[in-house]
Amino acid sequence: MPHSDELDAGDVLAVENLNIAFMQEQHKIAAVRNLSFSLQRGETLAIVGESGSGKSVTALALMRLLEQAGGLVQCDKMLLQRRSREVIELSEQSAAQMRHVRGADMAMIFQEPMTSLNPVFTVGEQIAESIRLHQNASREEAMVEAKRMLDQVRIPEAQTILSRYPHQLSGGMRQRVMIAMALSCRPAVLIADEPTTALDVTIQAQILQLIKVLQKEMSMGVIFITHDMGVVAEIADRVLVMYQGEAVETGSVEQIFHAPQHPYTRALLAAVPQLGAMKGLDYPRRFPLISLEHPAKQEPPIEQKTVVDGEPVLRVRNLVSRFPLRSGLLNRVTREVHAVEKVSFDLWPGETLSLVGESGSGKSTTGWALLRLVESQGGEIIFNGQRIDTLSPGKLQALRRDIQFIFQDPYASLDPRQTIGDSILEPLRVHGLLPGKEAAARVAWLLERVGLLPEHAWRYPHEFSGGQRQRICIARALALNPKVIIADEAVSALDVSIRGQIINLLLDLQRDFGIAYLFISHDMAVVERISHRVAAMYLGQIVEIGPRRAVFENPQHPYTRKLLAAVPVAEPSRQRPQRVLLSDDLPSNIHLRGEEVAAVSLQCVGPGHYVAQPQSEYAFMRR
């Protein structure tokens, strides 16, 4: 039913008194209460707030995707102006009508592209499906349009990418595919739910710029859901702040950042880690915690002087890890991905060494190779004086009690059929460490330490938000009191307050138990806060390594400087350089089988500070 006279001039979407609830054990749990907002054509509205504040369920309610999940949605008004300029009431549309609205008039980019894309269909088939459905195009026409969309989101060799499957693409490429799919029918409204959270800083910067460019080209309204205030400053026109299911403040991006009125807004801004905040400091510092009574409750500046002198707990020498690529009629291995090439470093008890770099630089593969989750083709891995790269599977299992891994994707790390209490309890059972009652008490303690409740132990992974699932994975990794924890983007999906709590927890455990962390991250502000030393990886090799203060305050390698320059800053008035929208700034690390790559030569430029001399300056400085 048209409502053309009920939208204000320029508005493409208007919501009044939105209420969302879920039934749990015959009780109605309110998720969103009396939420009202509007969106103008060509405008970006950022919805910000912590995990559980109601941001994502609001987006799902607009897309009418909550009913099938048991959500109870009530709204006085939910008007959308379609591409045809017809205004419809979304709550009155049937399921069949909504299938035509989704994609054609409203589209959504989800937080986790790997779980949003169908693993059994090629990229081209998935984009073409939306085009055929909404534009009545033939298969051939849809594939031509799919290639054009991949070109539009700046994916090179689009024709080749069309025939690839999601698992064959990097995280940044998969997110661009999601954007191409969402924009393939030129929707009036795009909802982006944390689309850059898991991406490295350079790809994140390109994705943000890409959304702005395409928004201008299509005169599209954008709802951008995020907890990253630096991203908000870079992309938003207006900001809506949510807390416990309610809107507590709304205004222009300048008003929110320069004159916030609500205590929670001030607390959010004060808790944002600022790059450069650790200038002049040698050791990690705790994060300030969000508090409505004390907007940025600063804890005493306790220095983390936790590194133990003596022998390293972990020593890596000339680590090599490669993946075969098959081709030809005989399906022979003809090329190899040189993921990690002759990487060497030491890790001392009580130390945090951070690995930073772009997608495809070899950070995660290095972490996986240390636990033999992927095989290495060369080098030595020595833990507590014992070589572990040659251990039998039985001995390796016992060793994994002392080296634990926190993976990047929390949903894929948890068994959907197990309660989270059982998931945390599993490593204790496998190693036979605690009897039943003591183990249950340990689970309750771990849940509380990571900011959850003991009664959450009886719930399943799908009942938690992405940030909460990551906290569960961290609790499981801490269960065995390991000596080394490899954290692969462990806090990238968390909002600022929970991220601060988790980092502070990791620092407390490091201080109390001498745990060493290999911290893999793209969040340079967090890396600056938590690290004793930092190593920058490029094309599988370490190109700069040294004390955190030296690397951040005096970066020597062009690639390190590029990573630091790409970090979003929580200041909307700051002028940002325009970047070339490339799918990946890295040259290819795929080589013919048997071809050897020259190892970089690290030169000492300061105490403990080593840097490689770039062989080709332009390769590191592309923008």
Curated annotation (Swiss-Prot):
Family according to the record: Belongs to the ABC transporter superfamily. Glutathione importer (TC 3.A.1.5.11) family.
Protein's cellular compartments: Cell inner membrane
Enzymatic reactions: glutathione(out) + ATP + H2O = glutathione(in) + ADP + phosphate + H(+)
Gene name, Swiss-Prot/TrEMBL: gsiA
Alphabetic keyword roster: ATP-binding, Cell inner membrane, Cell membrane, Hydrolase, Membrane, Nucleotide-binding, Repeat, Translocase, Transport
PANTHER family per UniProt: GLUTATHIONE IMPORT ATP-BINDING PROTEIN GSIA (PTHR43776:SF15), TRANSPORT ATP-BINDING PROTEIN (PTHR43776)
Residue ranges of domain ABC transporter in the record: 15-269, 314-564
Function comment: Part of the ABC transporter complex GsiABCD involved in glutathione import. Responsible for energy coupling to the transport system.
Organism, as annotated: Escherichia coli O1:K1 / APEC
Keyword Membrane applies: yes
Cystine bridges: none
Pfam family, one: ABC_tran
Location, primary (coarse class): membrane
List of residues binding ATP: 49-56, 357-364
Protein EC: 7.4.2.10
Annotated GO CC locations: plasma membrane
Molecular function GO labels: ATP binding; ATP hydrolysis activity
UniProt-recorded name of the protein: Glutathione import ATP-binding protein GsiA
Keyword Repeat on entry: yes
CDD domains: ABC_NikE_OppD_transporters (cd03257)
Topology relative to the membrane: Peripheral membrane protein
Family annotation (PROSITE patterns): ABC_TRANSPORTER_1, ABC_TRANSPORTER_2
Binding partners and assembly: The complex is composed of two ATP-binding proteins (GsiA), two transmembrane proteins (GsiC and GsiD) and a solute-binding protein (GsiB).
GO BP: peptide transport; transmembrane transport
